[in-house]
Amino acid sequence: MPLYEGLGSGGEKTAVVIDLGEAFTKCGFAGETGPRCIIPSVIKKAGMPKPIKVVQYNINTEELYSYLKEFIHILYFRHLLVNPRDRRVVVIESVLCPSHFRETLTRVLFKYFEVPSVLLAPSHLMALLTLGINSAMVLDCGYRESLVLPIYEGIPVLNCWGALPLGGKALHKELETQLLEQCTVDTGAAKEQSLPSVMGSIPEGVLEDIKVRTCFVSDLTRGLKIQAAKFNIDGNTERPSPPPNVDYPLDGEKILHVLGSIRDSVVEILFEQDNEEKSVATLILDSLMQCPIDTRKQLAENLVIIGGTSMLPGFLHRLLAEIRYLVEKPKYKKTLGTKTFRIHTPPAKANCVAWLGGAIFGALQDILGSRSVSKEYYNQTGRIPDWCSLNNPPLEMVFDVGKSQPPLMKRAFSTEK
């Protein structure tokens, strides 16, 4: 907990900030520079061979409730070591988070843990607080998908978002496919056995470790050559010389030979255009095309990239090169209206930027109180405001009793003096 905690506004204890990601959860306290813990978003059940993912959108509500209850209990009483009744909660969420998941999560926090208030904060908006800017094009490359959302003058431009199922999960699937097809394993019994004969599938944790330790993103010229050789339409395209092979130890007894050609080709699926000519780079350009023309220049010059997948070596350099390459094509050249693109460097690792923004916002105790859903309101109504609902109650009914009416959204998230 921060030093001099009792000297805040009215001596109120600092808020708990939770970024509940599909692969990893970041958790800590407002006002701190980094999360106290980054743990896999899973729980272990007796009799279950594999850990159970907590963030699931296709299971029934009661099952989800029990998973979230157990997982948040672990956060509070194994990692944070604080009483949940004493502290407000800031939850970092995706704007595409299904309503039933948000409602189940808030039910767990209010009914089971009895927290004083909950603020559900969009991850893209929170990322801007770390940079002190009002307008940016924010791309979140996470585990399940890559999601882009423009923020202009502190307001998310919701009709210009874009998403593709390109993230850590897609990389793991591609990596596993290539490893099983091409790689060999040395065991105590024999050398260079085919991987499928030794193990039918590769655990998710091993795939992630191989990805992080060995894979990287090639530059644009090399990447285009790798893609051309992969599809080999004209039949005479040569692949660039691969990087060195890597020997990866499996469970202390086996050695997996990871081919160099796999190390640089796996990540190309993020930049290969599919049948609809979509990739991570076109996500940004297509979103920009949907924005009002007088906002495009400012948004293009303020790109913010967050999410764990964007931490791969060479990712940002390649993304910027792809954008500058694509913007010269006829589809964008005549209509986009700008050719200058710049990427910000946030003051935290890409996977923790949204959490840090939530920690900054959670430290503003007066504003936090005026923007949070209070326990009293939730107990009366059993519901929370939802941006995609047309049946939201008046603002003065939602926020803490005794607090002044909340400022306009623009002012609440503005960094202007």
From Swiss-Prot:
Where it mainly occurs, coarsely classed, is: cytoplasm
- Pfam families given in the database record: Actin
Q: Which CDD domains match?
A: ASKHA_NBD_Arp10
Gene Ontology process terms (BP): retrograde axonal transport of mitochondrion
GO cellular component terms attached to this protein's record: axon cytoplasm; dynactin complex
Any coiled-coil regions, as ranges: none
List keywords of the entry alphabetically.
Cytoplasm, Cytoskeleton
Localization per record: Cytoplasm, Cytoskeleton
Q: Its function? A: Part of the dynactin complex that activates the molecular motor dynein for ultra-processive transport along microtubules.
As for family, the record states: Belongs to the actin family.
Q: How does it assemble?
A: Subunit of dynactin, a multiprotein complex part of a tripartite complex with dynein and a adapter, such as BICDL1, BICD2 or HOOK3. The dynactin complex is built around ACTR1A/ACTB filament and consists of an actin-related filament composed of a shoulder domain, a pointed end and a barbed end. Its length is defined by its flexible shoulder domain. The soulder is composed of 2 DCTN1 subunits, 4 DCTN2 and 2 DCTN3. The 4 DCNT2 (via N-terminus) bind the ACTR1A filament and act as molecular rulers to determine the length. The pointed end is important for binding dynein-dynactin cargo adapters.
Name of this protein: Actin-related protein 10
Source organism of the structure: Sus scrofa (Pig)
